[in-house]
């Protein structure tokens, strides 16, 4: 199966892509535009340094409060190099206990912590310091000449480390707050771990030893440190959660098992905007190719949008085909809402793939990481084609993101649900291999999922979920949707095998609930990644599905696969419980089913 993505970390016999590594050049990767690259590099270094300084100031301030509260006295002679009972007990619950003990013993404040709840402050603070150091160390490479593939991996890493420092800073602020929400902390820690994985995976196949070796050293143990944070935090809030493979979200009080037109927490004015005809919407920015708007391009509109806005900024993109390649709503562009003229009318398109010597992360035609992102009535497309392998149409890493009434069209790796909490409603998603993939906590509801005709000898796999740690609150929940064959796949008369998903990482988690599954889906339902990898640690579930492909009699018999028979278990993957849709603080909502009922 040479068409596959890179194999899972730590797996033997993993499959690699057929992409050839770019030759090492004695020039910067974007030699066609050296001045732009130098500006970008200098800007990246300055931004990274500023982010690091702010993060360290925040961590120091918060840590000072923790120090005062715990009455730290790290210098007690009898305690030197001997872990406290709290450290020993907490680290026993982690997946990396030796690193847990050693790292905490070397960090101020740990020995004075008397419980796991006290220790979590120190643990997150320590992890934040390590990520901040990695970001600072990485920034020193900004001016180094790199071949294109190494430059893409490096740029991805710097961005992801920056996002992780922000996520860990928010987690640290939250754990010292009396009003902390456990689901927020778990989400941000999960995102930091996912960011690290994406960063390291970007260097797979990179032959630039100097850059790769430097980054490998800078990133050492970061994944394990976040994993330990997740374990200690989970145990400090609910010890029972850690005992099972899936840590499921707790049921929210007051959430009814019925359809709500809009979330209760959504502002009345914004509720109207989501359903309001375009002609009645007062947009802050209008994009029109003919010049009859605020901007002619989407990239210009994104630049014009304010940073860290406390209100919804509406960008209306008029009908037309916008091919600007690698558009991105950055982390500081929060609360942006993109409104188009409808599926197939407003089209955001691109054709980047890994064959352009860039990471999968950078192939996205459109990407959004700013919290509270909403897109409505737009088509996102990557036209690179099946022969170009990984080619993302839409990548979402924004927390509390909503994609409503959109088309997402591609082949391999069409939709990258990268991280944080996401909700898709009434979307049409087209692809072939692993075309819904990533490690967000995401619910797709009332969506149509179309498998297309792949290349010869390829198999279609709808999902490739990459949950790496049992304490991450991530997974893909497909609820009240339709799994269908596109017209080109129908024409093959069943010669192409299509599967519901396969495990990209060890604790991969995907469920299909109350959905229609077409006859093109193989009777086994699910496909191995390779041999027996993750078959006993994954969580794949099916609940009350219908259609000719929903039969359970010949499904796989893996230890991690289950037919869900309990309503309580199925409820764990609903909007209300899996992504806490009814409690999101930013106003980023859409009509949805809170529970299971249709």
From Swiss-Prot:
Residues 24-36 have a biased composition (Polar residues). PROSITE patterns: PECTINESTERASE_2. Pathway: Glycan metabolism; pectin degradation; 2-dehydro-3-deoxy-D-gluconate from pectin: step 1/5. Residues 81-232 are annotated as: Pectinesterase inhibitor 34. Its EC number is 3.1.1.11. The record marks 412 as: Transition state stabilizer. Its main location: membrane. It is found in: Membrane. The chain crosses the membrane at residues 46-66. This is Probable pectinesterase/pectinesterase inhibitor 34. It comes from Arabidopsis thaliana (Mouse-ear cress). The lineage of its organism: Eukaryota, Viridiplantae, Streptophyta, Embryophyta, Tracheophyta.
